[in-house]
A protein has these predicted regions:
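Buried hydrophobic positions in well-ordered alpha/beta secondary-structure cores of metabolic enzymes
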Residues: 1-3, 19, 36, 64, ...
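A short core secondary-structure module
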Residues: 2-48
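Glycine-rich phosphate/pyrophosphate-binding beta-alpha loops
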Residues: 6-12, 53-54, 207-214
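Short, well-ordered loop/turn and helix-capping segments at boundaries between secondary-structure elements
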Residues: 22-25, 39, 43, 65, ...
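Glycine-rich beta->alpha junctions and the first turn(s) of the following alpha-helix
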Residues: 45-141, 208
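Glycine-rich phosphate/cofactor-binding loops in nucleotide/flavin-utilizing enzymes
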Residues: 84-93, 97, 182-237
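Hydrophobic packing residues in well-ordered alpha-helices of helical domains and bundles
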Residues: 104, 130, 160-163, 198
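C-terminal helix-coil-helix/basic helical segment that borders enzyme active sites and/or dimer interfaces
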Residues: 116, 120-127, 138-191
Length: 237
């Protein structure tokens, strides 16, 4: 296989990678794709970290030049690549963030702690935004628990389509709240590890509405699959 995969999380720390590749000559779009598991420690594979705004490099570009995968490492059948990738992406966008919600709660608790210390909590606007963040996090958890309970009602299935849009925008807004609570400390390097954590959270949260499907893609999914609206015109790949 030859080609490139971009924005691969933690590829520089991984032994294996999954790849969606074209397996049928002349096929276009979502047709003719295969879902492969490939070892990274082989000739023909190069990994290049992508520097992020916060200074880290969690994402990577992976280049393949004649790399190989075993036939036993095909997931599903040749031609099913798109279907398998969408099922995996649906999990990433949805209930896989249940564990992430614990980190969200820690970040919110940290914001409240600092707001009480530096007086930001005296602002009615800050208190309102904290309350909004708290209720939003609870709503996320309850929806995720409903999905986990195997509730197959049409209402729950439609609401599940909103989950990625909901949590990613919520977390981005939490980063903005954190910076407003920190006030001037948001703009400088601090010895307080709490400030550094919130600064890093603010920077990384900017990507939440992009990876796993942008806001625009999520709104299309909600409109077309959840509300039954006409599909947006699409070009051919």
């Amino acid at each position: 296989m030859s080609g490139q995969k971009v924005w691969t999380s933690l590829a520089h720390l991984s032994d294996w990678i999954f790849v969606v590749a074209r397996c049928e000559e002349g096929s276009i779009g979502r047709n003719g794709l295969i879902f492969l598991l490939m070892p990274l420690s082989q000739p023909g594979v190069e990994i290049h970290p992508i520097k992020q705004i916060g200074g880290g490099a969690e994402f990577n570009s992976v280049f393949f030049d004649g790399a190989r995968a075993k036939a036993d490492d095909v997931v599903g059948q040749p031609g099913d690549g798109w279907k398998i990738a969408m099922a995996l992406l649906g999990f990433e966008r949805g209930i896989s963030t249940l564990g992430q919600q614990m980190s969200f709660q820690q970040e919110l608790d940290l914001i409240v702690e600092i707001a009480r210390e530096n007086g930001s909590s005296r602002s009615p606007a800050i208190r309102q935004r904290v309350a909004y963040a708290w209720t939003g996090l609870r709503a996320m958890r309850y929806l995720a628990m409903r999905v986990l309970s195997d509730d197959q009602s049409p209402e729950t299935r439609r609401e599940a389509l909103t989950y990625k849009y909901q949590w990613s925008n919520w977390h981005r807004d939490l980063g903005r709240l954190a910076m407003d609570v920190l006030k001037m400390d948001a703009n400088v390097v601090s010895d307080d590890p709490r400030c550094e954590r919130l600064q890093q959270m603010f920077l990384f949260a900017r990507a939440d509405t992009i990876y796993g499907g942008t806001n625009e893609i999520q709104l299309n999914i909600i409109a077309e699959q959840g509300l039954g609206m006409p599909r947006e015109p699409r070009g051919k790949l």
